[in-house]
Amino acid sequence: MKKRIFAALLALCLTALTGCDWSTADPEDIFGTLTDYYNVEQKKQDVKLTSFALPYLKGETADPITCSDGAMQTLGALVYEGLFALDGQFEAQPALAESYTYDAARYTYTITLRSGVTFSDGSAVTAQDVVNSLRRAQSSARYSGRLAEVSDIRASGGAVRITLTGDNRSFVSRLDIPIVKSGTESSTFPTGTGPYAYSGEGGAHLAQNASWWQGKSLPLERIELTACKDTDSVSYAFYAREVQLLFCDLTGADDSSVYGSGDYTDAATTIMQYLCLNTRRAPFDDPAVRRAVTLGVDRASCVSAYLLGHGLAAQFPVSPASGLYPKDLETAYSQDGYASALEAAGLNTGKTRSLTLLVNQESSFRVSTAQTIAAGLSRYDLQVTVRSLPYDEYVQALEQGDFDLCLCQVKLTADWDLRCLLYTSDAADDK
């Protein structure tokens, strides 16, 4: 049975660092990063680069549906494309899709494929290629969540029909899922349609895809690939200047890859840190108290101190990078404003209310953030202490409602569907 939780969306909408997962960014972002490295007249560099190399995990698949996060997914952004691509404001722009229609009565999208598009081997992209990739994505760890409401995917001539279980007018924002050529899925580098293609001739590298349908000028003709055995060796290769681009996740449990000197490029993501309030316990069963707490977190300071500025403070569950973000409705943080709200909620009686803020101890970033939030909220009657637990115990406490406040993380879909936060039978944390 589903249980209702109240998520006070004291949000920190995160960016990823490319250059020191930009899983929601389009290839233009990484092209810009590559170009910057070669623009030595405008940037000071200790060493002028004569080649550019990216890491890959030896023995692991580059299949964009099943590959691991990080290095392999970064390569995939250069080799594969989806039906749509998200721009910098998270708006879906046609890529392999030329156009689409939506039948609201039948909850069905009909997507017409762009004509003349071929894979890097010269073979035509077909509707069945798209269907096969999307069906595989339905059962994958990375994409199954965003396709959970899909009831049917089928080819119809040169089009793809996707039927949903309910109405969703923004579903195409979820369809930046990479498409690979059917029958090549088991290859280490399946065949794609992107600007580059894998080649083993003369050493592992990415070569320009001569048949790329977009035909844009690319910053590099060849990108060398450096084999690494694991993420630690990827970090070492970056610091040794064997590779020139490193994916960094400042919020991960393992933050050993961060962060020395280098040039940083941010790409907005849909990852959101938020504070969950247990409305089944006092004092958060009182709407006035919940409103007060939303004013008591200095989001900007958390981003500055613990994300090194690589994030966006948000008061609503939408990235501020999105055109949908209601910036005009924001309330500026102030200690006086928080104090006034506590007084209005009757929490200035002198009687201490001890509360616990639950957090996953495996992320040092979240523990530090939780401690700062707890200190900021501890005013007048409220005294908030942090309870950090190993992940499994953290999830158990969250599912059992054994908390007053909880610092959580979620990766939203680009259509900003909040149902996973408002009604869920699982812990709202992705570790």
Where does each model-flagged region fall?
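Aromatic- and charge-enriched surface segment that lines or borders ligand/interaction sites
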Residues: 68, 98-142, 283
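Gly/Pro-rich hinge or "lid" segments in bacterial periplasmic/extracellular proteins
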Residues: 163-164, 168-222, 232
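Append "and occasionally in soluble cytosolic enzymes with long acidic Gly/Pro-rich linkers
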Residues: 285-375
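Conserved small/polar residues in nucleotide/adenosyl-binding loops
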Residues: 423-430
